[in-house]
A protein has these predicted regions:
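Short N-terminal or domain-adjacent regulatory/targeting segments
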Residues: 1-9, 157-163
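Short hydrophobic beta-strand segments
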Residues: 7-20, 145-149, 182, 245-251
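Conserved mixed alpha/beta catalytic, RNA-binding, or beta-rich assembly cores of soluble enzyme
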Residues: 18-191, 256-267
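General small-molecule cofactor/ligand-binding pocket signal
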Residues: 39, 133, 202-206, 248
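A polyampholytic, Gly/Pro-enriched intrinsically disordered region
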Residues: 115-126, 220-235
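Short, structured coil segments at secondary-structure junctions
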Residues: 128, 198-199, 243
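Conserved phosphate-binding/catalytic loops in two-lobed NTP-binding clefts
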Residues: 196-225, 229
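C-terminal edge-of-domain segments
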Residues: 234-267
Length: 267
């Protein structure tokens, strides 16, 4: 399955929720998911638009067979009861992700690899400033996060070269990289998006608010601070995109690109 963001945005997607809070999140997701249909519980406030349902179990079968992607905003247990009985095989089941109503977590629930739920979870999490929860073993074993900052309009090939050369010089294998991470101010940098796509590595954005809130012992970039009010991009993004991280490669600058590497302690 094509894991490119553009493919996710154009895929037929069902957005489902049981609550007003969930409906507000659905509205936010509509801006990035073009080919979507909204399903709202009958008790959701009438100001929200969407097809209404009384019982999720009554419509889950049709949704499961009709959509490539399913985003359910509500309790994971409800999603499991509604869709779990319908699962057949990872090569044909739709991608299902679950989001809590406060947008803290986006869980890749079904068809993580073949169905694209892992990629979908990251796209949704980036947009909602949430934490993607991906438990497939291949991804879980990866322990490196590459933080990247770049000058505006830098070509993807330059970013790819900066990442690959940094990892090579440090004797680090690309297969260990779980995320390429950057600050949310870089979301529209096509060179960065294309570089991550070329390398086949998920691109994770860290909120500027989170970067300014945390204090770590890394070198402050005067340029980044003067332009964006941030202490840096590459190092804090690498650290904050993971859990129990330590910076193992301090930032390195090359041709308008800054790269840093953090390692997660997974033991």
């Amino acid at each position: 399955m094509n894991s490119e963001k553009a493919s996710i945005e154009s895929a037929r997607t069902a957005l489902i929720t049981l609550s007003d809070e969930g409906a507000a999140l659905v509205e936010r997701l509509c801006s990035i998911l073009d080919n979507r249909l909204i399903f709202l519980h009958a008790n959701v406030d009438p100001r929200f638009s969407g097809k209404r349902f009384e019982r999720l179990l009554d419509i889950s079968g049709n949704i499961f067979s009709s959509f490539r992607n399913i985003v359910f905003i509500g309790p994971t247990g409800v999603a499991v009861r509604a869709f779990g009985r319908l699962a057949s095989h990872k090569t044909i089941d739709p991608a299902i992700v679950v989001v809590d109503v406060c947008a803290r977590y986006v869980i890749s629930l079904l068809s993580g690899h073949e169905g694209g739920a892992n990629d979908l979870a990251i796209v949704v999490a980036n947009h909602l400033d949430a934490e993607p929860v991906i438990t497939t073993t291949t991804e879980a074993r990866k322990d490196l996060i590459v933080g990247v900052g770049c000058r505006k309009a830098v070509q993807s090939s330059v970013i790819v070269e900066a990442i690959t050369s940094t990892l090579s010089m440090e004797g680090l294998d690309m297969s260990r990289v779980r995320f390429i991470a950057s600050a949310d101010i870089k979301k529209t940098e096509s060179g960065l998006v294309d570089a991550a796509r070329f390398l086949g590595i998920p691109l994770r954005f860290v909120s500027s608010r989170e970067i300014t809130r945390k204090h770590y012992a890394f070198e402050i970039s005067d340029l980044v601070y003067s332009q964006f009010g941030l202490p840096g991009v590459a190092e804090p993004s690498a650290i904050l995109a993971g859990r129990r991280t330590e910076l193992i490669v301090p930032k390195r600058k090359s041709n308008g690109v800054t790269v840093a590497v953090a390692r997660e302690n997974c033991t």
